[in-house]
C-alpha cells in the first residue's frame, strides 16, 4: 500500500501538558540559539505535534488545581497572556473524613495537599491555551491523527504511522478510505497519557521497564455540576477521604468551585481494588448522595462527565526514559506524585527536559540512545526527583490497606522512605468473587434513586461525555478470547468489566445459540479511560486507538 510520508525533525505524540510544554520549550531554545548566531544554525526545522482527539483538549480531563512551578518556568508572564484556562484561585480548603452518614473536618490539610492561592483550572482549556502558544511559535499541530505504529530503521525509532481511516466493521475499505501516513522524525517524543499505545510498543520493544516497578493506576471519574446562581462559593476546595470506599481500597474525592456557577466533583479509586465489583461511576453517585455532599451540590444538575486512568506508581514506576530515537514523557512515563495526586507540573517539566535533550540532538545531528540518555540525567538533577523520590514507597504502603498505609507514609515523611519496596500490577490484586462475598452473583444495587439530573446512570453520563465513534469500523477494544468471558471469568469474577468500565461498554447478553451469556462490546460508548486494559484479571483486553478524531469531547473538564 502506498502511504504518504511526512518528514519532520521532532515529533511530539500527544496533545497533553507534557508534549505541549516540550514543544514550546524546544521552539524557544531554537529561537534563542538562532538569535545568538551560534553554530550550527537551526533554521527551516519542522517541529510537529499530533493528537488523536478531534482538537487539542478534546480528551483532556483532570481535577485540576495546578502547581504552577513548571508553567512559571516555561512562560514566566503567563498571567499576562490571557489565561483562559483559569477558573479560580484556591481561597478556602477543607479536608473531610466521611462515614456513610457523617463528615468530620480535619483541623489541617495533610502534608503536601495544601493549595491555598493555587490556580483552579480546566485542563482541556489549559491544553488549548498551550496549543495556541506552541502554534504561535511555529509548531505544526495535527489534531485528529491517532498513532498506531512506531516506525523503525536499523534498530532506531524513526517516527510514527497514523491509523487508516475508512475501514468498515469487517475490515474492508469503504469508499472514504484514507491510508494512514508515515511521519518520519529524527526524534520522537511520546506523551500519550496513561497506558499509551505507542509508549507500550516502545517499552516492550526495548525492555524499558525491566528495572522498574509496574505502572499502576487509579480510575478518576469526574462530573461538572451546574448550580443555581449565587450558590457557588468562590475558590472553594474540598477533599474527602473514606466513604464510599472501604478501608482496603485506596482513593479519595475532590470538589472544586469553578467559574460560572459550577462545581467539579471527582472520585479516584485504585485499580488494584480487591473487589471485582468495584464500580467507580456508581461510587461517585453514592458520594453525591452523602448528606454532606448532597447539601452542597444537590440543587445542581450534571452537565459534563468524563473518566480517565491516573498513573499513581510514582518514582519507582518510571521506566527507562529513552531508546534509540525516542523518549517518554508525562503520564506515559508515570510522572505523577501519588502523595499529592498531582502530575501536570511534573509532566510539563519532563516534556521541557526532553525538549532540551532533543535540542542538543538536533545540534549534533545525532539521536542515538547515547545522546538521548542525557534526558534521564536531567530528570535526576531536577526538582522532579526532589519531589517524587521521597514518595517512592507511597503505593506499596497503600497495598497494606488505607489505615496501615497512611501510618507507613507518615513514618516515611518523618524518617525517610527507606529501601524501595516492590509492588504488583493492579490486576494481580483482584480477588475472585467468592473470596470477596462468599456468594454469586454480585449484590443488587437498589440504594440510589436515579433522577437523571443529579444522580445519573452510566448511559446518561456517557451522553454528558460527548463521546462519538463511527459505528461501522472495527472495534478498538480487542478481546483475545471471548469464551473466557462466558465461562471462566463469569464463574471466577462475575465479569467485572461490566462494573469497572465507567461507560457501560461491556455487557453480558444471553445468546439463544450458545445458551449462555456472551460478551457484547458497545465500543461507541468508550471514553478512552483505559480501565479495561489495566484491570482485566486475565489481561485479554487491549485498547487500541479508533479512527483519529473520535472519542469524548470534554471541553471544560
Locate predicted features.
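Active-site-proximal substrate-binding core of FAD-dependent oxidoreductases
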Residues: 40-44, 334-340, 352, 356-402, ...
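FAD-binding beta-loop-beta segment adjacent to the flavin cofactor pocket
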Residues: 307-338, 461-472, 485-500, 507
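N-terminal FAD cofactor-binding segment of flavoenzymes
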Residues: 25-29, 42-100
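Predominantly flavin-linked oxidoreductase catalytic cores and closely associated redox partners
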Residues: 41-43, 124, 128-129, 133-295, ...
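N-terminal Rossmann-like FAD-binding beta1-loop-alpha1 element of flavoenzymes
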Residues: 8-48
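Iron-sulfur cluster-binding cysteine motifs and their immediate structural context
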Residues: 491-524, 530-553
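C-terminal helical "tail/cap" subdomain of flavin- and related membrane-associated enzymes
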Residues: 359-456, 468
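Conserved Rossmann-like nucleotide-cofactor binding loop
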Residues: 18, 55, 195
Amino acid at each position: 500500500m502506498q502511504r504518504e510520508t511526512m518528514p519532520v525533525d521532532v515529533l511530539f505524540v500527544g496533545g497533553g501538558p507534557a508534549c505541549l510544554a516540550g514543544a514550546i520549550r524546544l521552539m524557544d531554545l531554537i529561537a534563542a540559539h538562532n538569535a545568538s548566531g551560534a553554530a550550527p544554525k537551526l533554521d527551516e526545522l519542522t517541529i510537529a505535534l499530533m493528537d488523536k482527539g478531534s482538537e487539542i483538549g478534546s480528551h483532556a480531563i483532570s481535577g485540576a488545581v495546578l502547581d504552577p512551578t513548571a508553567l512559571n518556568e516555561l512562560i514566566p508572564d503567563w498571567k499576562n497572556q490571557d489565561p483562559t484556562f483559569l477558573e479560580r484561585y484556591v481561597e478556602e480548603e477543607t479536608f473531610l473524613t466521611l462515614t456513610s452518614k457523617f463528615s468530620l473536618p480535619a483541623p489541617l490539610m495533610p502534608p503536601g495537599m495544601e493549595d491555598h492561592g493555587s490556580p483552579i483550572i480546566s485542563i482541556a482549556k489549559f491544553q488549548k491555551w498551550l496549543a495556541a502558544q506552541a502554534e504561535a511559535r511555529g509548531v505544526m499541530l495535527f489534531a485528529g491523527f491517532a498513532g498506531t505504529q512506531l516506525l523503525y530503521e536499523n534498530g532506531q525509532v524513526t517516527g510514527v504511522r497514523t491509523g487508516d481511516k475508512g475501514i468498515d466493521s469487517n475490515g474492508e475499505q469503504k469508499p472514504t478510505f484514507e491510508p494512514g501516513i508515515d511521519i518520519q522524525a529524527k526524534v520522537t517524543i511520546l506523551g500519550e497519557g496513561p497506558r499509551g499505545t505507542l509508549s507500550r510498543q516502545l517499552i516492550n520493544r526495548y525492555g524499558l521497564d525491566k528495572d522498574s516497578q509496574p505502572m499502576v493506576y487509579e480510575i478518576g471519574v469526574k462530573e461538572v455540576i451546574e448550580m443555581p446562581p449565587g450558590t457557588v462559593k468562590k475558590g472553594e476546595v474540598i477533599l474527602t477521604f473514606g466513604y464510599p470506599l472501604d478501608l482496603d481500597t485506596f482513593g479519595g474525592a475532590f470538589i472544586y468551585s469553578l467559574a460560572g456557577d459550577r462545581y467539579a466533583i471527582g472520585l479516584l479509586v485504585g485499580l488494584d481494588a480487591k473487589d471485582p465489583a468495584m464500580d467507580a461511576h456508581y461510587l461517585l453517585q453514592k458520594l453525591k448522595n452523602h448528606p454532606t455532599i448532597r447539601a452542597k451540590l444537590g440543587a445542581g444538575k450534571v452537565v459534563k462527565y468524563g473518566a480517565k486512568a491516573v498513573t499513581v506508581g510514582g518514582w519507582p514506576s518510571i521506566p527507562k526514559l529513552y531508546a534509540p530515537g525516542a523518549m517518554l514523557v508525562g503520564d506515559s512515563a508515570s510522572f505523577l506524585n501519588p502523595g499529592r495526586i498531582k502530575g501536570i507540573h511534573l509532566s510539563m517539566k519532563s516534556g521541557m527536559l526532553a525538549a532540551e535533550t532533543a535540542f542538543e540532538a538536533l545540534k549534533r545531528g545525532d539521536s542515538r540512545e547515547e545522546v538521548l540518555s542525557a534526558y534521564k540525567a536531567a530528570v535526576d538533577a531536577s526538582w522532579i526527583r526532589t519531589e517524587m523520590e521521597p514518595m517512592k514507597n507511597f503505593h506499596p504502603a497503600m497495598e497494606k490497606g488505607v489505615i496501615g498505609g497512611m501510618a507507613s507514609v507518615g513514618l516515611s515523611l518523618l524518617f525517610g522512605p527507606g529501601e524501595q519496596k516492590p509492588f504488583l500490577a493492579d490486576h494481580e490484586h483482584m480477588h475472585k468473587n467468592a473470596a470477596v462475598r462468599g456468594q454469586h452473583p454480585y449484590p443488587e444495587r437498589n440504594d440510589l434513586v436515579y433522577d437523571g439530573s443529579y444522580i445519573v446512570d452510566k448511559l446518561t453520563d456517557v451522553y454528558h461525555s460527548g463521546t462519538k465513534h463511527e459505528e461501522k469500523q472495527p472495534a478498538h477494544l480487542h478481546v483475545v478470547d471471548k469464551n473466557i468471558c462466558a465461562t471462566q471469568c463469569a464463574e471466577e469474577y462475575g465479569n467485572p468489566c461490566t462494573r469497572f468500565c465507567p461507560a457501560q461498554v461491556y455487557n453480558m447478553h444471553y445468546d439463544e445459540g450458545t445458551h449462555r451469556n456472551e460478551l457484547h462490546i458497545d465500543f461507541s460508548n468508550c471514553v478512552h479511560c483505559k480501565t479495561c486494559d489495566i484491570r482485566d484479571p486475565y489481561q485479554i483486553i487491549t485498547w487500541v486507538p479508533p479512527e483519529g478524531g473520535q472519542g469524548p469531547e470534554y471541553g471544560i473538564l
